[in-house]
UniProtKB/Swiss-Prot annotation:
Keywords: 4Fe-4S, ATP-binding, Chlorophyll biosynthesis, Iron, Iron-sulfur, Magnesium, Metal-binding, Nucleotide-binding, Oxidoreductase, Photosynthesis. Binds 1 [4Fe-4S] cluster per dimer. The keyword Cell membrane does not apply. The lineage of its organism: Bacteria, Bacillati, Cyanobacteriota, Cyanophyceae, Oscillatoriophycideae. GO terms for biological process: light-independent chlorophyll biosynthetic process; photosynthesis, dark reaction. Homodimer. Protochlorophyllide reductase is composed of three subunits; ChlL, ChlN and ChlB. Belongs to the NifH/BchL/ChlL family. This is Light-independent protochlorophyllide reductase iron-sulfur ATP-binding protein. Its EC number is 1.3.7.7. The keyword Protease does not apply. SUPFAM superfamilies: P-loop containing nucleoside triphosphate hydrolases (SSF52540). One of its GO terms (molecular function) is metal ion binding. It comes from Rippkaea orientalis (strain PCC 8801 / RF-1). The gene is chlL. Its cofactor is [4Fe-4S] cluster. Pfam families: Fer4_NifH (PF00142).
Length: 289
């Protein structure tokens, strides 16, 4: 049985870097993995392959849009740790519908029977869920993962994505596996959000410069660790996420917070910060100093 994952989150939050490292972690656990980039920028799999692979749209144009002339090897490229990679691509800037391209990519891969060849398929999807086309991967996913940080905007976007998961779960066996906190030294705002909208937190990745550098180098953290073993501890974050997913967690159908309520909840966190209450011992220590 194929495990299908869909990774969403605010634009620029680090979804692609996170996705590539999760895909690699799953491959390190012995799984055959396909990662599908669903973004017109077509850079989802750059960290796995080290270059911008041709997109399905590029290939269709070369074949004059004759779908029957396309073979799996025309659109699937081998990445690090044996992870297979596909990029949907998109229409020219300012023209056409990127969401439609995502839907067509899924359709083509199903016609090629590509979905049957893998233990895990991971969709890395553009930013927020802005239309039905970009929500299409949720129709095929077992779990949605939301990448966020400890900030207002990313959690506001996460809430909208949670609403899409809830809507799709009405007609599909879809669950939210949980949040992944990325590039954050704190999690207090994340904790405040999940108090209002209960959902699991799979992992919190601290602000580690090497994660950003890996993106620029076009390498996963696992590949960088081969020449710098001190980075092994970073890989353990992604292996932990992979192990949780392979255990087939129960997940949740989230109840998103209404926009205005969430706006008030999150903004209040900044405008009215809670001052931690000091214990008597702490007060005495302060007086002695």
């Amino acid at each position: 049985m194929t495990l299908t994952l869909a990774v969403y989150g605010k634009g620029g939050i680090g979804k692609s870097t996170t996705s590539c490292n999760i895909s690699t972690a799953l491959a390190k656990r012995g799984k055959k993995v396909l990662q599908i980039g669903c973004d017109p920028k077509h850079d989802s799999t750059f960290t796995l392959t080290g270059f911008l692979i041709p997109t399905i749209i590029d290939t269709l144009q070369e074949k004059d849009f004759h779908y029957e002339d396309i073979w799996p090897e025309d659109v699937i490229y081998k990445g690090y740790a044996g992870v297979d990679c596909v990029e949907a691509g998109g229409p020219p800037a300012g023209a056409g519908c990127g969401g439609y391209v995502v839907g067509e990519t899924v359709k083509l891969l199903k016609e090629l029977n590509a979905f049957d060849e893998y233990d895990v398929i991971l969709f890395d999807v553009l930013g927020d869920v802005v239309c039905g086309g970009f929500a299409a991967p949720l129709n095929y996913a077992d779990y949605c993962l939301i990448v966020t940080d400890n900030g207002f905007d990313a959690l506001f976007a996460a809430n909208r994505i949670a609403a899409s998961v809830r809507e799709k779960a009405r007609t599909h066996p879809l669950r939210l596996a949980g949040l992944i906190g990325n590039r954050t030294s704190k999690r207090d705002l994340i904790d405040k959000y999940i108090e209002a909208v209960p959902m699991p937190v799979l992992e919190i990745l601290p602000l580690i410069e090497d994660i950003r550098v890996s993106r620029v180098k076009g390498k996963t953290l696992f590949e960088m660790t081969e020449s710098d073993p001190s980075l092994d501890y970073v890989c353990n974050y992604y292996l932990n996420i992979a192990d949780q997913l392979l255990a087939m967690p129960e997940g949740v159908v989230p109840n998103d917070a209404p926009d205005r309520e969430l706006f008030t909840l999150l903004s209040d966190f900044y405008l009215n910060p809670q001052t931690p209450v000091k214990s008597q011992e702490e007060e005495l220590d302060l007086m002695m100093v």
